[in-house]
């Protein structure tokens, strides 16, 4: 994404998608396939689908209603975008109903113990995925698989499939969904490698509280994003913890192993994470902020263009520069006020990528855990199987998003100085990059 041609969302929508959107618009004009996003209608549909009525409280209602308002008034969704949004909201509501029903019938789920988790807290594109997937190679940690992050709650058919020795229907659903995503947005694979069974972050679980940045990545919803930034999201994190218990219960995980958590959203909601897990061990990776902003803008752009043709790269650039700046400020404030030194550890992206064994040894020393030979071998195996750029190089330019590299550097200099983060090129204001 480094040509002189101005980026346009429509150029990223494949011809079959354009034809499908055209057909759906025609159907909508005839009163068919309008994909109603009305919250009350979606709640009623979830209840009808499951035969259940208890969502486990109403903390999700305000963010869901605000989300729908932003989708209707700001996102300018195409018909496919409306369909995807409706399907996503209905899936989340359905899972909440199944989750509440499950803990009522199986109180042992809530009784499960959870050791203090290890949480990777860093900006998107700062090495958090690489770090999590390396550490998840160590069998002494619990981690999510991609399909579990989408469908964390087993529904009746899942139990039936397991009893009959058949594949979990959630796995089949995610495999089909990933194929569709990679067809519609093939460039995503170079940004964030996707696989049904790959280690994945828990932002999909936070989404079940309707308080997640995932919605921001797929639609232009600034009003919802501002609410998310400025309101406490403890309720969503509490529900995330419940879902982790459900997943562990269904897998019959040992109760003495800690979860390995990771999500860039923790930068924004570190206060909520610590409300739920006050003694979590935080691992905080840091990368050249100029690179982070450019890579983040490209990541968001490649996702958001699927569902709207009117979003502009300049809007993405300004929104995510501002968001990055605020997330950094907020996380630093929370760390200074609420996290004791023995519970936080800083590591540079450069160290993770150039000498991963040394970086990992420092992390394990901080955790007070041995970095065993078996864990090292497993980590090296993951690296050997996941060479950088195997899905294509992720290319981007700040100028594609209307951003001046010097302005980005000036606004985020406080962060670079705080952690002595090195520049990733000899010219600190070089705008074109990979990764």
Task: Locate predicted features.
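Flexible, glycine/threonine-enriched loop-and-boundary segments that flank and lead into catalytic domains
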Residues: 253-279
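Conserved phosphate-donor/acceptor-positioning beta-strand/loop module used by diverse small-molecule
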Residues: 273-298
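Post-Walker A helix-loop "phosphate-sensing" segment adjacent to the P-loop in P-loop NTPases
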Residues: 137-147
């Amino acid at each position: 994404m480094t040509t002189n041609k101005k980026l346009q969302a429509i150029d990223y929508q494949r011809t079959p998608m354009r034809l499908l959107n055209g057909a759906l618009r025609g159907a909508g004009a005839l009163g068919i396939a309008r994909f109603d996003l009305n919250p009350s209608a979606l709640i009623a549909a979830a209840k009808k689908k499951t035969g259940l009525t208890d969502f486990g409280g109403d903390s999700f209602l305000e963010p869901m209603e605000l989300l729908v308002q932003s989708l209707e008034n700001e996102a300018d969704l195409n018909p496919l975008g409306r369909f995807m949004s409706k399907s996503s909201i209905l899936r989340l509501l359905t899972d909440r109903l199944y989750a509440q029903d499950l803990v009522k019938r199986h109180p042992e789920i809530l009784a499960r113990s959870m050791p203090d988790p290890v949480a990777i807290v860093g900006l998107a594109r700062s090495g958090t995925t690489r770090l999590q997937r390396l550490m998840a190679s160590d069998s002494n940690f619990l981690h999510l698989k991609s399909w579990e992050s989408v469908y964390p709650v087993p529904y009746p058919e899942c139990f039936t499939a397991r009893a009959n020795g058949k594949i979990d229907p959630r796995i089949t659903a995610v495999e089909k969904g990933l194929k569709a995503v990679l067809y519609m947005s093939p460039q995503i694979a170079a940004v964030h490698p996707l696989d049904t069974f790959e280690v994945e972050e828990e932002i999909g679980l936070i989404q079940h509280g309707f308080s997640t940045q995932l919605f921001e990545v797929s639609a232009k919803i600034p009003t919802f994003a501002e609410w998310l930034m400025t309101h406490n999201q403890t309720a969503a994190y509490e529900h995330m913890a419940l879902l982790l218990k459900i997943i562990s219960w269904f897998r019959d995980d040992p109760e003495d192993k800690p979860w390995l958590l990771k999500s860039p959203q923790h930068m924004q909601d570190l206060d909520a994470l610590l409300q739920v897990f006050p003694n979590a061990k935080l691992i905080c990776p840091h990368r050249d902020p100029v690179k982070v902003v450019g890579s983040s803008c490209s990541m968001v752009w490649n996702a958001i263009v699927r569902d709207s043709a009117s979003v502009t790269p300049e809007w993405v650039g300004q929104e995510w520069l501002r968001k990055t700046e605020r997330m950094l400020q907020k996380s630093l404030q929370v760390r200074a006020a609420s996290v004791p030194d023995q519970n936080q550890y800083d590591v540079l992206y450069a160290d993770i990528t150039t000498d991963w064994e040394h970086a990992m040894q420092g992390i394990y020393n901080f955790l007070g855990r041995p970095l065993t030979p078996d864990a090292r071998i497993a980590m090296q195996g993951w690296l050997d199987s996941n060479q950088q750029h195997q899905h294509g190089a992720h290319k981007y330019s700040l100028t594609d998003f209307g951003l001046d590299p010097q302005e980005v550097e000036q606004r985020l200099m406080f962060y670079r100085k705080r952690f002595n983060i090195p520049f990733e090129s000899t010219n600190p204001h070089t705008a074109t990059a990979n990764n």
